[in-house]
């Protein structure tokens, strides 16, 4: 129970996770973090053990780690700039990681419409 509380607190400290809601997804060991228009599924057992990227005492990324979660965060590090984080039907309009944030910023060349976007993120772990 304390580990679950620490993970929830850690998620609430970071702006990217600030609006998160943690929901139990049926299986006691599976949880989901829900963002506006985004759903990230945590690995089985993630809520039952300390998050590998989060210092449970300070609720911040551990020393040497960049991030805890997000479409541009893998293994506690930001993905390289230019990594596709959201694919569209037209290659030139994909969304790319910046290399300095866990977020997936919208391609500035896109219009307001999302008609050309696929229904899931490029990584398959985040639905947008």
UniProtKB/Swiss-Prot annotation:
InterPro entries: Disintegrin_CS (IPR018358), Disintegrin_dom (IPR001762), Disintegrin_dom_sf (IPR036436)
Domain Disintegrin: start-end pairs: 47-112
Any Pfam family the entry gives: Disintegrin
Transmembrane segments: none
Cellular component terms per the entry's GO annotation: extracellular region
Primary localization: secreted
Entry function: The heterodimer bitisgabonin-2 preferentially inhibits the adhesion of the alpha-4/beta-1 (ITGA4/ITGB1) and alpha-9/beta-1 (ITGA9/ITGB1) integrins to VCAM-1 and also acts as a strong antagonist of alpha-5/beta-1 (ITGA5/ITGB1).
Subunit field text: Heterodimer with bitisgabonin (bitisgabonin-2 is the name of the heterodimer); disulfide-linked.
Full protein name: Disintegrin gabonin-2
């Amino acid at each position: 129970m304390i580990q679950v509380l620490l993970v929830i607190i850690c998620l609430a400290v970071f702006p990217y996770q600030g609006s998160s809601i943690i929901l139990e997804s049926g299986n006691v060991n599976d949880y989901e973090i829900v963002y506006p228009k985004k759903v990230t599924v945590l690995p089985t057992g993630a809520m039952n053990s300390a998050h590998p990227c989060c210092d449970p005492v300070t609720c911040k990324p551990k020393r040497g780690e960049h991030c805890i979660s997000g479409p541009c965060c893998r293994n506690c590090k930001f993905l390289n700039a230019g990594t596709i984080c959201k694919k569209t039907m037209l290659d030139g309009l994909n969304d790319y990681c910046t290399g300095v944030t866990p977020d997936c910023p919208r391609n500035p060349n896109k219009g307001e419409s999302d008609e050309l976007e696929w229904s899931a993120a490029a990584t398959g772990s985040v639905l947008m």
